[in-house]
Amino acid sequence: MHSQHQPATLQEEMERPERYDDLLQCCLPNYAIFFGTVAEYLPAGEVDILELGSGTGWLTRTLREANPDAHVTAIDRSPAMIALARRKPELGAVTFLEADIRAPWPGGAFDIIAATMVLFGLSIPEQEEILRRSAATLRPGGRLIVGDAFLPESPWEEGIYRAHWREYMIESGVDREEADAMIASRDDILHQIPTLAVFRDMLKDAGFSRVLVPYWYELYAVVVAFI
């Protein structure tokens, strides 16, 4: 008997570089505001930016548009994602490096370190190490900009926000079963997603002196930490 081919899940589809950009818009509420807020906190001029987990270059493009004079170094562990990003003509001036962000970063100091939808996939100790290394790598006056998923303060809030998230995905064209599977996958990593209050403390412990949260919508937020 021939086995039937099982269609790829939404999460598996998001691992495919050619599908990632489209699916990101379907799964991340207010994605334009989310990434735009990251860009709003870039200083002007010839600054050096290190992007962690750059993927297909969605944020990379936003950074370049916000500050064309910036020198951007982007790290991602997926050669396929980097290959797709390199094919985007607007990212021709970006230096792409294939590496795991937990491995040593390129030498030198940076003015900005940016990471979106990356840290939630790491354990809390790994996140703490990334924050410490960021603080040590940034120049005086530098800042770390993180856009990521965060844990609400109560299960009651989590439930309400999940319902809104599901509604958004379905309205964006995601199949109901796939939306449910995406939401259920959050349970697998819930133990390593900090609340914003805990993340603030993690940043302070890592060596950052001041922290802003300029954007926060339900399960997602943008955090800016200053040296």
Give the ranges of each region predicted by the language model.
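Class I SAM-dependent methyltransferase Rossmann-like catalytic core
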Residues: 5-7, 14-32
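Conserved alpha-helix/loop element of class I SAM-dependent methyltransferases that forms part
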Residues: 29-45
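Class I SAM-dependent methyltransferase SAM/SAH-binding core
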Residues: 50, 56-103
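A conserved beta-strand element that flanks and buttresses the S-adenosyl-L-methionine
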Residues: 114-115
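A short glycine-rich, Lys/Arg-flanked "PGG" loop and its adjoining helix->strand segment in the class I
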Residues: 128-140
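Conserved beta-strand signature within the Rossmann-like core of class I S-adenosyl-L-methionine
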Residues: 142-149
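C-terminal alpha-helical "lid/dimerization" subdomain adjacent to the S-adenosyl-L-methionine
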Residues: 149-204
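Core SAM-dependent methyltransferase catalytic element
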Residues: 209-227
